[in-house]
Amino acid sequence: MSTFFQKQQQVAALDPRLGGLMASAGLYNLKALIKAIRSCKTLADERSLIQKESASIRTAFKDEDPFARHNNIAKLLYIHMLGYPAHFGQIECLKLVATPRFTDKRLGYLGIMLLLDENTEVLTLVTNGLKNDMEHSNMYVCGLALCTFANIASEEMSRDLCNEIEKLMGSSNTYIRRKAAICAMRIVRKVPDLIDHFVDRTQQLLSDKNHGVLLCAVTLAIEICRQDDEALTVYRRAVPLLVQHLKSLVTTGYSPEHDVSGITDPFLQVKILRLLRILGKENAQASETMNDILAQVATNTEASKNVGNSILYETVLTILEIDADNGLRVMAINILGKFLSNRDNNIRYVALNTLSKVVSMDTNAVQRHRNIILDCLRDGDISIRRRALELSYALINESNVRVLTRELLSFLEVADNEFKLGMTTQICLAAEKFAPNKRWHIDTVLRVLKLAGNYVREEILSAFIRLVCHTPELQAYTVQKLFSGLHQDFSQESLTLAAVWVIGEFGDVLIQGGNFEDEELVREVQPKDVVDLLSSVLDSPYVNGLIRQFVLTSLAKLHTRLSDASQQSRIEQIIASFETSVEVEIQQRSVEFATLLKRSDIRQGVLESMPPPEIKQTVLGTVSEAKPVGSTRSDKDALLDLMGDEMPVTSGGGTGADNAPSGATQQSTHDLLADIFGGGDMGGMPSAAPAASASAAQKPKSSVNDILGLFGDGASAPAAAAQQAPTPAPAATSSYGGLDLLGGLGASSSASTPAATPASTVAKSHTVYTKHGLTITLTPTTNPARPEIVHITARFTSATSAISNINFQAAVPKTHKLQMQAISNSTVHPDSTETQPLRVMVPPGAAVRLRLRIAFQVDGHSVQDQTDWAQPSA
């Protein structure tokens, strides 16, 4: 750095004027400053140099030397680009703009754009200078002013200079017109009230022959359409003109001025396609006008280079957004399928992302590319794997559930941990929804538990247990499989929980099941083997508090299910060993179970098999990437979920017991559990009282007294009072809020009453279409626990002849979210009814609104129609 100062002194000795200038302004020019900064060895040296140079520049500004001002502003802007403060040069930039020299104006405007923003107070001083330069005879000076305006204009400046910008949009100079159009876009964004000033001007510019002006005009039109829906009507009249522009770009020969990789002006083509997409949305006439040119672009554009791919991608988005023909939509999806075979990861990503959005529109067309989508699961790019997974979930249906599930399970073995929670959830939901039979369903969930048992949500685990309880013909098979799986691996928490629960509940079935194959070996399970396995679980390094709770309950149940006295004694010893546990819940269970097992007169009734809980569809919220089960599960919620409860689900994926549920949901939950357990008060819920009272009245007095006096002495008087009360005494309390896996102390299954479940609200069917012999009705269904989700069943019937090739499409407003499944059969016969499920998520309190498009063939004629439907208010 010292060499620069030496040269500085040498120059000063040769020319006193330059020496004085350098003395006041530090280094002589920008080039010298850059070299000096680059030669600094440390950051401290650079800061010291910048500080000294900034001080010299600040001092030089006081001399009002025009030559020095230009030089100092150039150095100051470089200092600003390095991240150091340079705000003290703002006024000097205004002085440069006021000079007549073009070079000074150029540097001054550059400084204004860098040092000022729309919130700076100094900006108000710039307005007059911009107005004067916009009227300058030199188009380059005018261009500088327009460029500055487009970068920093505030709302006030936009209002002040709106008329000047509108006037310049009609200039005869193409250079000025295109810059004025960009300035108009800035005004439209800042002050939407001024849109009316530019609608007509923009429409005139859309007829311009200059590609630069046309590009800016189309960009401005896009912004106006986004800001003002009324402008859509005006610009839709220009659709034929835009189609003509696009056609000339596609069919024109080689144009050196606009050619990019053999394609004429791809930037303009993309902008026109984007504007056509906006204008054609929800407008059949405009869509019909652009169908042919879109097909031409999709067919003739070369896809060997990224330039062509960008145009094809924009074309696909346009086709999918407008009311295009079915053939055109299939072509668009096929283009996306070709993108999946591209080597460029970016192209494959956007293809997967777009297919995920359109799979509900035309599932069959996307299904054709299923193999390529599955290949993307093995891609090295994690983002592509994630998008391929999401798309694979959407493709699962009754016909391909076996194939896709097999592929997903294969990928689950090698998937990253961050994918496993979502995968286990989606695989199990697909198995629940599309399983060809219950054995395949059970095998699939068992496979999931073995592969990723630490990444299974508690809702999935409880749904699996409900399934086992409701499938008595497969209980022996399931308990044997779980016994074998747990014997091989203790590390998968959900597998351990499921196996322990099922073994405890169906231990007698396991013992009586006889021989079964285990790893190509035939084995027979003895009572000792069962107790040994559960004891090994308690001693394993993977055990936690929740597993201990499950094992203790399972052992207590096995005590009544095993006839081997030695194993019963061993179970009592294992349970008693936890009476001094430091975990309160474990200690409490151990003491209660130990006391219960000594009461031979009641333990058989207390520990008898539970009645199967009500089976229902698993309802999940947003899949969280957090730990799914065990550590994230509260003890109180575990049993509620296990018994089929539908507590509100938070976005984190856990149950909503800690979030105050609505009264209706909470009441229904307690009613359900009260019936399952044979009539407990469950916290004194009013609606459960009648059933509980009736249940209590049927029980012998001695049994009630025994239950109430189970863990205390002298309970006869309270017992009599409890028997006469309208509600029975609650079950023994635990961290489950009065509920236990025992199935209710003393509550027999015969006393259970029909479960009062949260009833779904079913609206009457609404006929939305009746033409050409085809009748379509919609039946919306909502669940009080999830009122924002509306399940709609579309039913198709034919009055006369067969109707084929039915293509039923639906669109919703931006505030709704729609999922559609495939129709049960695309051909409707007069004696049949076909269905197609829809799932709509709406904002709270909003009604469902659908725009329906129906295409079909009847008597050899193709019919295409459209109708709107709004859900009537309740």
Curated annotation (Swiss-Prot):
GO terms for cellular component: AP-1 adaptor complex; cytosol. GO terms for molecular function: clathrin adaptor activity. It is found in: Cytoplasmic vesicle, Clathrin-coated vesicle membrane; Golgi apparatus. GO terms for biological process: cytosolic transport; endosomal transport; Golgi to vacuole transport; intracellular protein transport. It comes from the Eukaryota. Keywords: Cytoplasmic vesicle, Golgi apparatus, Membrane, Protein transport, Transport. Belongs to the adaptor complexes large subunit family. Adaptins are components of the adaptor complexes which link clathrin to receptors in coated vesicles. Clathrin-associated protein complexes are believed to interact with the cytoplasmic tails of membrane proteins, leading to their selection and concentration. The AP-1 complex interacts directly with clathrin. Required for apical growth extension. Adaptor protein complex 1 (AP-1) is a heterotetramer composed of two large adaptins (gamma-type subunit APL4 and beta-type subunit APL2), a medium adaptin (mu-type subunit APM1) and a small adaptin (sigma-type subunit APS1). AP-1 interacts with clathrin. This is AP-1 complex subunit gamma-1. The lineage of its organism: Eukaryota, Fungi, Dikarya, Basidiomycota, Ustilaginomycotina. The gene is APL4.
